[in-house]
Amino acid sequence: MRILLTNNTLSARAGSEMYVYDVACQLKRLGHQPVAYSPELGEVAELLRAAGVPVVSRLTGLDFRPDVSHGHHHVETMTALACFPGVPAVSFCHGSTPWQEMPPRFPRILRYVAVDLACRDRVVREANVPVEQVQMLLNFADMDRFLARKPLPDKPARALLLSNTAKHVDHAAADNYAATVRDACLSRGISLDVHGSTCGNPTSHPEDLFHNYDLVFAKGRTAIEAMAVGCAVVLCDLAGCGSMVTAATFDSLRPLNFGLQSLRLVNTVDTIAAAIDRYSPTDAARVRDRIRQEARLTDTVTTLIHLYEAVMHEQALRPADPSAELLATGAYLQTLDCILKGQNIKPATARA
């Protein structure tokens, strides 16, 4: 199967960029032919190429026609639909607020995938996509890469804050939550290291980094990967603080992607210290075992392959409707025009 994966950038290591990397590499391992497209290339594009996955920054003039498009971000998804007439697509929503994540409406987008409940609500309520076209597919970790660590100590000694939003702990800024996390850790006798692009200390190998720490402050897929290694995880980011992920809270936090909707508290020394106090090596091991069982990259890609096959089959049975596609393109361009002009309107939807 030939799969085109689109993303607004393939530069820095970030959420949807690494999602493309993990999925494309697994597809290739299974004998499929993934190609990644983004107008902005960089480090992640080079990682994909090193893994044998072709990467392009333009779709015109290619000696490649996909069987299906895996679409992240509406501009790139619509570009793929325009460049490859007759090819069906699956549109993915990875964020409940960024404008780039608003899923477009188009006749050949036959399924929509949301990575958590907030994204699902956005697809249904804001983009007006029928519920029967929407599937929630929760995030994952590559368990062959993020191997389980040795058992945690009875008391945590070393903590890691891993986020691209974190500043250096000594940076003088009102929103420097890294300094707040550091102070909370110090109040419990724990040292803290901060890694991420904003603080000038990025990491290329979090799978190795996690093994050096007992406690990790993170959100989203980073939190999932830390759990898979076996670290105790406190949900935390610039937006706020959540709880320690425990066996008791796992079921409520998993559909939220351990993400923004989980960060209900203000980042203060007291709230973060209270989360630290939930540390339990036994409980962290239970969380590790569950996430390793329920959030495997291999299972996710198997589900995606079935989804690709389903939309390809549906598209083969559908008559071509150029008029409907032109109407949908016009409605999309109207929406895009308003976005570019900074107007706050809901996406336009064409109806045949």
Feature-to-residue mapping (PLM):
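Short amphipathic alpha-helix
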Residues: 16-27, 44, 177-179, 304
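Conserved catalytic-core segment of nucleotide-activated headgroup transferases in glycan assembly
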Residues: 122-125, 142-201
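A short, active-site helix/loop in glycosyltransferases that binds the activated sugar's phosphate group
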Residues: 100-101, 110-132, 172, 176
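Acidic donor-binding loop of glycosyltransferase active sites
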Residues: 67-68, 208-221, 230-234
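A charged, aromatic-enriched C-terminal amphipathic alpha-helix characteristic of glycosyltransferases
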Residues: 15, 151-152, 263-334
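A short, glycine/small-residue-rich beta-strand->loop->alpha-helix junction that serves as a flexible
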Residues: 7-19, 166-175
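Catalytic binding pocket for nucleotide-activated donors in carbohydrate/polymer assembly enzymes
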Residues: 222-286, 290
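Short His-centered aromatic/hydrophobic patch
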Residues: 71-76, 93
